[in-house]
Structures are given as C-alpha cells and as structure tokens.
Amino acid sequence: MPDVQEQPGPTRVPILDLLRLAAVGAVILYHYGFWGPASHGVQQVAMPYLAPVAQYGFLGVPVFFAISGFVIAYSAEGRTPVGFAIARFSRIYPTFVICMTLTFLATLLVGHAWFHVTWGQWLANLFIAAPMFGQPYMDDAYWSLVIEVVFYVWVALFLAWGIFPRRIDTIIVAWIAITFVNELTLDIPLFEKLFMADDSGFFAVGLLIYEHYRGRRDTRLYSLLTLAMGTATFQAVHKLERLGVHTHGSFDPMVVTAICIVSLGIVFAATRIKSVPLPDSLVRAVGGITYPLYLLHLQLGYVILLAMTPTPDALSTALVVTAVVVLAWFVWRFLEGPARFLVVEGVQETHALVEECLRLRHGGRDRHVQ
C-alpha cells in the first residue's frame, strides 16, 4: 500500500507555518486593497486607499511557491511516486472541493446580484483547471493551484524516473535554462504553463533550501541558490509589465526586487529556527488554516462583504476577513480531516484494485506462455 502518512513531526519547521500565513495575508491585502473580483465588468476593491502598499501583495503567491518547494521536497523524501501522488492529492483536493463548493453556493444564493455562476462552472472547477473546459475559475485565486499541481506532477515523474532528489542540481539548471529561453526568446504559452516559466525560480529556491536543510554544504549549492534567487527576482520584475497593463498599476521594480530578496532570505533563515515561543497547537492551526483561507478569502469574502454593504469600509472589511478566517478554521478543524480520510481510502482501494487486475493479467499471460 502506498505510504501516504504525514512525515514525522520532529523535523517540522514550525516557523514556516507562520510564514505561510504571512504570505496569504499579503495576498488578502492585495485583493482587498488593490485588485478584487470583477462584478459586471467593474473591479471591486474594498479599501482602494491601501493600493500603494497593497499592490505589492501579489508577491505573497510566489513566496508561497518557494515555501512549497521546500515542503514538497521534504514530503517526497522516502516516498514512492504513487505514495507521493496520493499524499498530495489527498492534501489539496478534498479541501479544494469543499471550499470551491462553499464559494459556489454562497455566490449562487447570496451573491447572484454581483457575480454570475453556473452549475456547469462548478462541474468544470471539480477538475481544478476549469479554463481547460471553457469555464472560468470559481475564484480568481485558483490559478496558482494549477501551478502547484503541475509542480507536483513533475516531482512525481522525477521520482518515477529515479532522479529526484539525486539529480536535483541537473533538474534545476535545466529548468532555469528552459525558463530563460522561453521568457527571453520563444515566449511559448504552452512552455510557460508546462514548465512554470513565470515562477520556476521560486520553486527552485525552495528545493535548494531543503538541500541545505538536509545538511548539504558546498559551493555548487550556494551558486545554484544564488542563481535561483536571481531567477525568481527576474521573474517577479518581468511580470510587472503584464501586471501593470492588466491592473493599471504603477509598480516600482526596485521595491519588488527588495521584497523578493528579503522574503526568500526570511524563508531560508526560517529553516534554521527549530522552535517558536508559541503553543504547538496554535502553530499547527495557523499552518492548517492557510490553505482553506487562501481558497475562501476572495470570491466568498466579497460575496459576504457586498451583501453587508455596497460601499465597504475598513470595519466591514475587517469583519468579513475575520469571518473568513473563522470559516477557514472550521473547514480545517472539522471538514478537512474526514474528507481526506475518505479520499485516501478510496484512492488506495482503487490503486490496490488496479494492481490486482494487472497482476492477474500478467499471471494469465505467463500461464499462456508456459
């Protein structure tokens, strides 16, 4: 049976749970202070006066990718490709379906005056990459989840080929080379999606930080880490042109560069801190709510906010964000665990059935040959 248990606790990095919350907090600031969901073609922004600061909150997503690179490298260690895939699927999919469905129902029942949703859209979103089926994401924030899934698929393939993490240096050099070739010359949309060419540097930083965390110390590691951080910073600055056209914002590349370097430096430093002066249950709760909070904060948050008042202010926005945090905690505390258990049981039974069918099929062939 594939190994899908959580990795043992002693080597947890508790401060990463706090950094996850900080990254999600930056994204929430971005969506409530600079760029919210569109209602009938009009962009909703609860507190536009925060825009000069809030506009840089988009960097919370790529910083989260760096944290994900570290966590996924740790999660993959000692697992089979199938075990890793089941563990990742059971981690992200049940919570996604719960939060996406809550967002859909709230929009359908309460937010229909501001936002349009359909059952077809809900059905397409069950596959996460809804635009592949001609439907929009249920929540505009879901685009980053697709990138995460692509990253998981690559890691599972590398595990199957036996080159992860053994050939991590080669993987990262090739990945960064493809990134720059596509970003500077080819500009092929398929390559951008397939190789995560807009965010590869951040994932690479996380993977290399994990190498350092495992005890590796050599010149090549530090050189690659510098290259990956430079790539990540380049990618963040490179996004500004498109982001400026899309949002009509005015971004300072120097500010983006500084935020990237400092944020990635903090992630690196965090892995050297073994404990924090906070209750372990609180730290685990903080880490646990970040995923459902990210999935719920935007569309569902604005549905609640606009139902309260057509002209949001700081107080109403704070109340809504607090309510979404509580809802995220409820999802994590009471719904996520049972849903994950059901998914793991179902996937493991399906995997066992497939293996048994293949075994019987090969057994039949062997007898036929004899």
Language-model region placement:
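Short, charged juxtamembrane terminal tails flanking transmembrane helices
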Residues: 2-6, 365-370
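Alpha-helical transmembrane segments in multi-pass integral membrane proteins
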Residues: 2-15, 25, 29-53, 74-78, ...
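Residues within membrane-spanning alpha-helices of integral membrane proteins
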Residues: 17, 21-24, 61, 68, ...
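Residue-level recognition of transmembrane alpha-helices
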Residues: 20-23, 87-88, 148, 298, ...
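Residue-level signature of the transmembrane alpha-helical core
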Residues: 21, 28, 97, 101, ...
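Membrane-interface helix-loop-helix regions
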Residues: 35-59, 67, 75, 86, ...
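His/acidic/aromatic-lined binding-pocket segments of jelly-roll/cupin-type domains
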Residues: 62-64, 201
